[in-house]
């Protein structure tokens, strides 16, 4: 199964992702291990319109089809491309992953850390077990997909976050990809009815130009003004140490552009408490505060069981729980450092 276009794999070679290869005339794909697991609030993914406060059990493998110089998960995503990225894989079984997630109280299993599209077969197998156990499923992805892989994962994925890294094809080519496939994926996910949220990591001097942000947010609004768009703060990481870290003022400016483009649900992240109300969810009709946040912490939750505004009755787009059973507490869930025990 081709998970991205323009990636023919000859006999005895690996694809761009470095993890899918052809041997003996057969395509071999990653299976049976994890590069890391962690349990965190779902807001960390981030999903703000899907079961707020729920714990998300995240797992990843190794490898990626892009090579972003600022990758914050480079130890796993670039493990087969960069000799500095050394992560020993841990053998895993789908049933063991789901059991571990259930033990920790997670409600969602998330394929993340590396690029889940290049390990889609493994994720789908885990998601089959997760669904059988009553859990939800999600991808956190660069969105560099084809129709074939989207059709393959569609029956098994509830939530999907796409990193829309830029709206300039030249920038995408620097990262090893192209813009058009990402835009195709965003359109198709929305058409398929998979709950979609989009994130753009705002990098000074790379993708923060006013014109680019206007075009990016206008594109998202043209698909649906109700798609949540998160603009998050860059910090120096991996091979990108030249740009200055993103400031709160930069995030607020980008959010204003998004609102002018017609997006109703715009969020600023990674700098808790310094971006005004851009961490909160407000009703797009009457502007009532529905969910108040500080970082990943839910401070208040006012949505009705049917997912409507309690003040004006407007339906709020998202995937809401019938009853809020997440965390409203003084401190958010603090994950441990343990690694998965497999069977």
Segment roles from a protein language model:
Residues 17, 27, 172, 290:
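Short clusters of hydrophobic/aromatic residues that line enzyme substrate/ligand-binding pockets
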Residues 13, 55-64, 279, 302-305:
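Short metal-coordination and nucleic-acid-contact micro-motifs, chiefly zinc-binding Cys/His arrays
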Residues 22-159, 328-335, 343:
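Conserved Radical SAM active-site core
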Residues 9-13, 26, 70, 77-78, ...:
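Short, non-ligating residues that shape and space the ligands of small metal-coordination modules
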Residues 12-19, 28-31, 80-84, 295-301, ...:
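Short cysteine/histidine-rich zinc-coordinating motifs and their immediately flanking basic loops
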Residues 91-249, 254-257:
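Conserved AdoMet/S-adenosylmethionine-binding subsite of the radical SAM
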Residues 1-6, 16-19, 63-66, 70, ...:
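Short, cysteine/histidine-rich loop/knuckle motifs that typically chelate Zn2+
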Residues 4-8, 210-343:
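Auxiliary Fe-S-binding modules of radical SAM enzymes
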